[in-house]
Amino acid sequence: MSDTAATLTQDRQKLEMAALSAPAVAFTVAMIAFPVVYTIWLGFQTFSSTGKQSFAGLANYSKLISDVEFWHGLWVTIALFVLSLVLQLVFGVWLALVLFHAKRLPGIVRSLFISPFMMPPVVAGMMWLVILDPSLGAANYILQAFGLPPSDWLASPTWVIPTVALIDSWQWTPYVALIVLGGLQSLPPSVYEAAQIDGASPFKTFQRITLPLLLPTIVTAAILRSVDLLRFFDIIYITTQGGPGNASNTLNIYGFRVGFEFFDIGYASALMLTLTAIVFGAVLAFNRLRGAVAW
């Protein structure tokens, strides 16, 4: 009898917990589901100049195939994604190793190493606009001090993508470093003791032990950064707005301009849903890779 009463009490407590959490869960689901469903619906609509909308079927998606700006935006998005991700993973691992081995480094210095990613992207973009100013910026001043010619970093079609990638890498490499540092601190010390007894050099230890054991952590960092990099918007909009011309016009910037400058909401929704599919594809690919390298 007592067991039955205890079971009934537990069931009642579970029902009470479910009832109390239901409004918050419903609100969260609605806040996520409504924009997604509404955007999908908009992707099948077309809007006239007077604001009248009508069902367009797959017209917005078929337009993507012949849209030169879409393919250019896709290329720019992939170029920025690959360049930024490689820079952030390479230098993030290096910075994590520095912080891991420099245990006597003062706390204030460690904080300075990781401070950039705590800065709002808009502030970071404005700061780099000043630094890279062709007339008064510190970057060209340093180049000229070494006898090198100045460069118009953000106005050059050749340099704008590497420059934006460097700005984003400056901000988010410390974030990758913190993730990798957590992975380093969780590695079993016994394997390093065995390597030291065997006389392995630091490079061999990193190559044969540290890097293989860190691969799942590095892939996790790649997943987190991939989602942001494929949706890259804020720093580009602050520094170049997709220019010069369309040299840094990513899919996100292009979709924003189509929707809010040309007011083609249906086509902009189709662009954003296509970008969302690309993001999901990248995440799934990296998840498979993480499963393959897990230990």
Where are the model-predicted features located?
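A structural signal for multi-pass alpha-helical bundles of membrane permease subunits
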Residues: 13-295
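Short, Lys/Arg-rich, polar N-terminal cytosolic tail immediately upstream
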Residues: 1-12
